[in-house]
From Swiss-Prot:
UniProt entry keywords in alphabetical sequence: Amino-acid biosynthesis, Aminotransferase, Cytoplasm, Pyridoxal phosphate, Pyridoxine biosynthesis, Serine biosynthesis, Transferase
Keyword match Transferase: yes
The gene coding this protein: serC
Annotated catalysed reactions: O-phospho-L-serine + 2-oxoglutarate = 3-phosphooxypyruvate + L-glutamate; 4-(phosphooxy)-L-threonine + 2-oxoglutarate = (R)-3-hydroxy-2-oxo-4-phosphooxybutanoate + L-glutamate
Molecular function via GO: O-phospho-L-serine:2-oxoglutarate aminotransferase activity; pyridoxal phosphate binding
Signal peptide: none
Organism: Shewanella amazonensis (strain ATCC BAA-1098 / SB2B)
Its biological purpose: Catalyzes the reversible conversion of 3-phosphohydroxypyruvate to phosphoserine and of 3-hydroxy-2-oxo-4-phosphonooxybutanoate to phosphohydroxythreonine.
The protein's name in its UniProt record: Phosphoserine aminotransferase
GO BP terms, alphabetized: L-serine biosynthetic process; pyridoxine biosynthetic process
Summary of subunit composition and partner proteins: Homodimer.
Cofactor: pyridoxal 5'-phosphate
Residue list for modification N6-(pyridoxal phosphate)lysine: K199
Any single GO CC term annotated in Swiss-Prot or TrEMBL for this entry: cytoplasm
Length: 364
């Protein structure tokens, strides 16, 4: 079978080495004689897996000791609710920066739970010379106006990424579902980081929460046990049955990432993948990207064909070559190539080669 490169935005492709290992030990994990899907989450073998995976993630991201690492249910949308419910009791307020579809969705969920008067919003994307550019105003305050500031560093739908650190007098909460572990960050700048697993961590069904311990002292809005950070931390993410198979695969992804140079090494590869793809887009009038260069996502490269009538042909011919899931999100249309950690350089090179040949064939 010829190679297939999966550019899906999520659930996304997993590293081939991880998939092969999971296949090899699917029926007999860790010498147990049964699948990891069949063992008790409270048994010693899985407890060890949980401890090892947390240790690996802490090492990869250099997570300080004053942070909890939680393995939870619910994905990113689940965390939209969890953040509000855990931090906005006693009439607390929060500030949300909107840079695209996912930060907008988080804002809408926050308003639904806490009420419009508890959520202030700043739209931070402006059209500059016809391109979407992130412009974050100076944020000033004494630190007591808001319980937290929420933003999404990478917008998968819009192809927008915020690379610069945000200077905020309030604790920063970040939805890193689509760019976690793609480049180095200083975790200590954040009060909470959350990420749905299905892009750079593992399969869907799992979410990672990295939360500074002092944040758990804030009054809760509601006490929903399943998404209670305090309860989850007190029970080592085992208050209820976790998504064990997704956790196992995440643990294997962490090991794989360590073996290929860690986040520093992966960041170099990711930057090169994005550079090659954007260089192709910019060098041909046949394609266009609507994001300012400094905010172009390294994970989700969006582009449109100059002649939209060729969209279906582009997708059909790409798929025939094993380049799949390139259709853009229904809200924005066009194309989207998601090139998360697991996408090899060879996949990007194959896409670039096809894009150049397709453009040559259809250019007048």
């Amino acid at each position: 079978m010829s190679a297939v490169y999966n550019f899906c935005a999520g659930p996304a492709m997993l590293p081939a080495a991880v998939m092969k290992k999971a296949q090899a030990e699917l029926l007999d994990w860790n010498g147990q004689g049964v699948s990891v899907m069949e063992v008790s989450h409270r048994g010693a073998p899985f407890i060890q897996l949980a401890k090892d995976s947390e240790a690996d993630l802490r090492e990869l991201m250099n997570i300080p000791d004053n942070y909890h690492v939680l393995f939870m249910h619910g994905g990113g949308r689940g965390q939209f609710s969890a953040v509000v419910n855990n931090f906005l009791g006693d009439n607390g307020k929060a500030l949300y920066l909107v840079s695209g579809q996912w930060s907008k969705a988080a804002t809408e969920e926050a308003k639904k739970l806490a009420g419009d008067n508890s959520i202030d919003v700043i739209n931070v994307v402006e059209k500059v010379n016809g391109l979407n550019k992130v412009v974050i105003p100076a944020l000033s305050g004494n630190g007591s106006e808001y319980r937290y500031l929420h933003y999404c560093p990478n917008e998968t739908v819009d192809g927008i990424e915020i690379f610069d650190d945000i200077d905020s007098p309030w604790p920063i909460v970040a939805d890193m579902s689509s760019n976690i572990m793609s480049r180095e960050i200083d975790v200590s700048r954040f009060a909470l980081i959350y990420a749905g697993a299905q892009k750079n961590i593992g399969p869907s069904g799992l979410s990672i929460v990295i939360v500074r311990k002092d944040m758990l002292e804030l009054p809760q809005l509601t006490q929903s046990s399943i998404m209670d950070y305090r309860l989850t931390a007190e029970n080592d993410s085992m208050y209820n049955t976790p998504p064990t198979f997704a956790w196992y695969l995440a643990a294997e992804v962490f090991k794989w990432l360590k073996s290929v140079g860690g986040i520093k090494g992966m960041a170099e590869v990711n930057a090169e993948k994005a550079r090659r793809l954007y260089a192709c887009i910019d060098s041909l009038d046949f394609y266009k990207n609507g994001v300012a260069p400094q905010n172009r996502s390294q994970m989700n490269v969006t582009f449109q064909l100059a002649d939209e009538s060729l969209d279906k042909d582009f997708l059909k011919e790409a798929e025939a070559l094993g380049l799949v899931a390139l259709k853009g999100h229904r809200i924005v249309g066009g194309m989207r190539a998601s090139i998360y950690n697991a996408m090899p350089l060879e996949g990007v090179d194959a896409l670039v080669s096809f894009m150049r040949s397709f453009a040559a064939k259809h250019s007048s």
